[in-house]
Amino acid sequence: MQLKDFNYHLPPELIAQEPAHRRESARLMTLDRKSGEIGEGVVADIAEYFVAGDLLVINDTKVIPARLLGRKETGGKAEVFLVRRRDEAGQVWQCLIKCSKSPAPGSLILLSEGVTARIVERSEHDTWIVSFSPEEGFLDRLEMIGSMPLPPYIHRPANVIDGERYQTVFARERGAVAAPTAGLHFTESLLQKIRARGVDILPLTLHVGLGTFMPVRVKDLSEHRMHREYYRIPETTAKAVTDRKKAGKRVIALGTTTTRALEHAAAEDGSLDAKEGEADIFIVPGYAFKTVDALITNFHLPESTLLMLVSAFAGRDRLFNAYAEAVRRKFRFFSYGDAMFIY
């Protein structure tokens, strides 16, 4: 399978630069993956697509203000972008570093609020291992010195509104450097409407990491190596998934990140145990899904691994037909864009 098989034309004006006026006011495209039938509505009415006995699994990761501005000891400007936590305390991180010259191990970058970043060593994917000091309370200081890591296709600086809207209402566990964007559409009242239909809503955690920003660099997808992302599935969620699969009920994943965690952790029969690990699963067409029966997701970038995952779930031709229709109907794309419900 070739990278070019996942390209499509997207007019730049359809890339959402701002969130919808209200979370649940985003448009919703529905796609029946068996018939290919396409429908249209709004996210506010998504509860209508749930039935009693369904399980909705959400990702409760919380985006950290991962973009840090500072200066090198020589006075030159430097930008540090947190990618992945490398220790339990949250002091050591894998980072992208942008400055005039490549940093040297042992050198310092001076940030605000008395925080310093010491370059430890070079790591994978053009990143560096960086140790931050003071050692205690670094994650708390991030709220003061960092800014929201908006994706590069949003052509404006992060603002106060992004601090709220580039975060799900159920975000709990700090560690993501990008939002699980399908969840951005949901409000507490909408979740309550879904529960009222006899649906359980349970969390897992997957910290969205470096791969969100990394393009696929190979033409032949069999040569691609997926990035790793930390995840944790609690006992209550694992048991609920297992019970639904045994009973023939639906497991609905809110987002591709939730899907990756579930599919990485699941046994062949779809059952789950509580688990903590790193997901590096690369899902492309031909993959047999073990747990997920329906998927809520946004519209994804051409040639991205997320688009490949959704193509595997919906069928490539059906999905690309839906994307062409979304372009024709002027849906909004990517992180702050509209949503799909694929069943």
UniProtKB/Swiss-Prot annotation:
Family according to the record: Belongs to the QueA family.
Organism: Geotalea daltonii (strain DSM 22248 / JCM 15807 / FRC-32)
Pathway assigned in UniProt: tRNA modification; tRNA-queuosine biosynthesis
Record Gene3D superfamilies: QueA-like
GO BP, one annotated term: tRNA wobble guanine modification
Pfam family, one: Queuosine_synth
Protein name: S-adenosylmethionine:tRNA ribosyltransferase-isomerase
Subunit structure: Monomer.
General function of this protein: Transfers and isomerizes the ribose moiety from AdoMet to the 7-aminomethyl group of 7-deazaguanine (preQ1-tRNA) to give epoxyqueuosine (oQ-tRNA).
